[in-house]
Amino acid sequence: MATYLVGDIQGCLDDLLYLLEQAKFTPKQDELWLAGDLVARGPKSLETLRFVKGLDRSATIVLGNHDLHLLATANGITKPKKKDKIQAILDAPDSAELLEWLRKQPLFASHPTLPFAMSHAGIPPQWNLSQTQQYAREVEVCLQSDDYLWLLKNMYGSGPDFWSNELIGIERYRFTINALTRMRFCYPDGRLDMACKLSPNDPDVGELVPWFDLPRHQVLDKKIIFGHWAALCGHEDERVIGLDTGCVWGNSMTLLRWEDNARFEKACSVHAN
């Protein structure tokens, strides 16, 4: 049995299938962990949802910002953008089934036996793993309830940008969603920045600090696997592994086998515009 990890697919299913074949992934005995953003800029978002859903218990996914945006668009809260290439999902005969399945997926997942956990964007510096699980679960319960439209309608916005245990209601949920699906940089005081998408090496970053480089209030006892940040080009250190290597932007898709740290790479065509 092997455990495979992959970053943002964004509808680039052919690239994922190529990597899984190269790695000799076997659904009946292996696990595939996907760090969110299954859909959006690539050509096969519909087919990607069908494939991952079909893997059933062999696949673990966490929701990304594009996945949440798809749910909002499908429910008429936002209008579809041509560049997101999700119309095929909205028009599909199994659209309702796929969207219901997507809505039931978590924002955060921790492997039960291996020392890693996954969220799409990362974990804010104020939280430990137990808190992350708790706060993510609060949002998941709401998203999976009959009141999910209220959450989808009110999740957009960049504030609050700093965690407080006193946050309640939609402000609490919005911080959690932003931290787990949109965060890249923080300010030195721990406030989230929702705008900058640059590489940390770019001089225009200024005082901003990658979320994983800020001093943490509590040490995380698992390595954090995340996607979302293509400009990192697959950053890895003893604490984190970033697996978005920019497939949709014409760079590559990376599949990591946890047990021996083997990496499988596939050069990709540009799909984002």
Curated annotation (Swiss-Prot):
The EC number(s) this enzyme carries: 3.6.1.41
Enzymatic class: hydrolase
SUPFAM superfamilies named among the record's database cross-references: Metallo-dependent phosphatases
Gene3D superfamilies to which the protein is assigned, alphabetical: 3.60.21.10
Family: Belongs to the Ap4A hydrolase family.
CDD domains linked to this entry: MPP_ApaH (cd07422)
UniProt function note: Hydrolyzes diadenosine 5',5'''-P1,P4-tetraphosphate to yield ADP.
Transmembrane segments: none
PANTHER family: CYTOCHROME C5, PTHR40942
Keyword annotations: Hydrolase
NCBIfam families: apaH (TIGR00668), PRK00166.1 (NF001204)
Domain of life: Bacteria
Protein name, entry field: Bis(5'-nucleosyl)-tetraphosphatase, symmetrical
Reaction(s) catalysed by this chain's protein: P(1),P(4)-bis(5'-adenosyl) tetraphosphate + H2O = 2 ADP + 2 H(+)
One example GO MF annotation: bis(5'-nucleosyl)-tetraphosphatase (symmetrical) activity
